[in-house]
Amino acid sequence: MSLSRRQFLAVGSAAAAAGLTGCGSRSSLGGKNELSMWTWVGSVNDDLIGQAEKAIPGHDGMKLSMTRIGSNYKTKVLTALAGKSLVPDIVAINDDVATYFPNADQFHDLNELGAKDLSKDFLAWKWKLGITPDDKMMAYPMDTGPTALFYRTDIFQKAGIDIDPAAVADLAPDWDTYIALAKKVKQAVPGSSITDNITSIFSYRMAQAPKRYMTEDGQYIGDQDHVREAFDLAVRVVKEGLSANAQNGSTDADAVVTNGRLVAFNAAVWWAQLGPKNAAPKTKGLWRVTAAPGGAGNRGGSFLAITKYCKNPEAAFAFISWLESSKNQAQAFLDPVLFPSTPASYTDPRLSAPDPFFGGQKIVDVFAESAKKYPGAYFSPYDSIVGTPLSNELVNVETAGKSPDQAWSDAQRQIGRELTRVGAI
């Protein structure tokens, strides 16, 4: 099951031609002295945007006009590109950046605007994710989502476990030792869980892997051992009684944090805010963070791209490179808690301060190590086509008692049908 680089580009060009033809003339949003930008809530620092709305740094004759799109963000971006009219100059793109690669001809190659000279300032794996199969720099790095192990010190103490972050990391360097540790915690504090649901274990294990579902030359590898290992690990955690069975989107999702059932969680840096700080503020001081079992990982992170309809590409690049400088990424970590893709930010005093919610621990140090050690992995335009059936079948295992082997087989059959339908295999 393979698709060559040349075939991929041919398919991408055909998709772009078929999906992005429109009767409108090419035009971008906003006045001639404005750069229009689309993004979503919580993706940028408001103070920095406020500065650019007065004047683009280095381009005093230009200013930013930003729109926060609510629901269906990606659909609205693709619809605007398809119409080739009233297209924003700059768009934010989520971690599914590879799904935009077939439409790369609708975006500027940022290397032609000077991006290549700045690559040394960024995490190499993050930089690579914005590069298309034909080596065009389509998307500029924003934040990342390095992973680590969150845990409740009060619960671990009841199980007689040394709560020092370094000690916990030594006790659970891999998933086998971590599960053994979790069983000890559950024995001391019945009802304790180390995941909200089965799919989180699968997703975060895959987030540690150096390869995912497709190779760069288009070969399907989502049925290989590394994926099955993550699948089986998720099943094992459930079978050991260590999942809270709080499915995504359910009312129980936050409740397991609030009521204290979720006593440890291998998660991305952004979970600190979405999880304990929001759902369990009374647990302030009880949480710590340490290196995750199984190694460094990453889940999440965004990008900025400049559309071909941009009225002033040079000013647009000056803006995005300023916005995502190490100094400004450090500011964006404070609000809205976006973890930088620029390693120089990690030693910024604004990031390295102790966090009272985590008992005064400097948690940025833990996530910085994860971000730097993460091996990186290739994300294909078809990752969601592969990942969704696998996750759905895992839910069937946890909620309906489906046989794991049958769930795996059914997922692979559906994946094969869907990849065939879209011409990927």
Q: Where do the PLM segments sit?
A:
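Paired acidic/hydrophobic, glycine-rich loop segments that form the ligand-binding mouth/hinge
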Residues: 89-92, 263-268
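Hinge/lid segment of periplasmic solute-binding proteins
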Residues: 95-148, 286-288, 356, 369
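A ligand-binding cleft/hinge motif common to bilobed small-molecule-binding domains
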Residues: 98-102, 269-283
